[in-house]
């Protein structure tokens, strides 16, 4: 099951050239860029691991691509995404986020049903990948 989080998630994976164009756009807007990775694909997992430091005041697309390639080499079997942060007063938010690397196999999610007070049903879901300990999921 393909994970759909962030911008472009319903499109085919971006090529390196397309990624460069998105980074160039973010740089032209003076947005700070960071690279994150995780092996926990749950949609509510907001705490991905940060690769290095955020790339504040970077005006060179190749510098970002170098960091991206370094992250890909070390975490090739995990999810990797790029975030762009706009620090403009009144915005101060992540304005662009897209996945640029995925595991070769994405196992999908399990629906979990439990009974609550008054026989009410509660539903939650978890990734099949999280059945294994962190660091050995993919």
UniProtKB/Swiss-Prot annotation:
UniProt record, GO biological process: reductive pentose-phosphate cycle
Keyword field contains Signal: no
UniProt xrefs under InterPro entries: RuBisCO_ssu, RuBisCO_ssu_dom, RuBisCO_ssu_sf
Protein localization: Plastid, Chloroplast
This protein's GO CC annotations: chloroplast
Gene3D superfamilies hit by this protein: Ribulose bisphosphate carboxylase, small subunit (3.30.190.10)
Primary localization class, coarse: plastid
Keywords, sorted A to Z: Calvin cycle, Carbon dioxide fixation, Chloroplast, Photorespiration, Photosynthesis, Plastid
Family statement drawn from the similarity comment of this UniProt entry: Belongs to the RuBisCO small chain family.
PANTHER family registered for this protein in UniProt: RIBULOSE BISPHOSPHATE CARBOXYLASE SMALL CHAIN 1, CHLOROPLASTIC (PTHR31262), RIBULOSE BISPHOSPHATE CARBOXYLASE SMALL SUBUNIT (PTHR31262:SF23)
Function: RuBisCO catalyzes two reactions: the carboxylation of D-ribulose 1,5-bisphosphate, the primary event in carbon dioxide fixation, as well as the oxidative fragmentation of the pentose substrate in the photorespiration process. Both reactions occur simultaneously and in competition at the same active site. Although the small subunit is not catalytic it is essential for maximal activity.
Subunit structure: Heterohexadecamer of 8 large and 8 small subunits.
Other facts noted in the record for this chain: In this alga, in contrast to plants, the small subunit is encoded in the chloroplast. The basic functional RuBisCO is composed of a large chain homodimer in a 'head-to-tail' conformation. In form I RuBisCO this homodimer is arranged in a barrel-like tetramer with the small subunits forming a tetrameric 'cap' on each end of the 'barrel'.
Protein name per UniProt: Ribulose bisphosphate carboxylase small subunit
UniProt source species: Antithamnion sp. (Red alga)
């Amino acid at each position: 099951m393909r994970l759909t989080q962030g911008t472009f998630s319903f499109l085919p994976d971006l090529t390196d050239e397309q990624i460069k164009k998105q980074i160039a756009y973010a740089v032209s807007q003076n947005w700070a860029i960071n690279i994150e990775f995780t092996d926990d694909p749950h949609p509510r997992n907001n705490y991905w691991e940060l690769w290095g430091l955020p790339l504040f005041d970077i005006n060179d697309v190749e510098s970002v691509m170098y960091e991206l390639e370094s992250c890909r080499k070390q975490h090739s079997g995990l999810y990797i995404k790029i975030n762009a942060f706009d620090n403009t007063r009144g915005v101060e938010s992540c304005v662009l986020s897209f996945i640029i690397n995925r595991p070769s196999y994405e196992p999908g999610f399990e629906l979990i049903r439990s009974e609550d007070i008054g026989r009410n049903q509660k539903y939650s879901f978890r990734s099949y990948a999280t059945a294994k300990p962190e660091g050995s999921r993919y």
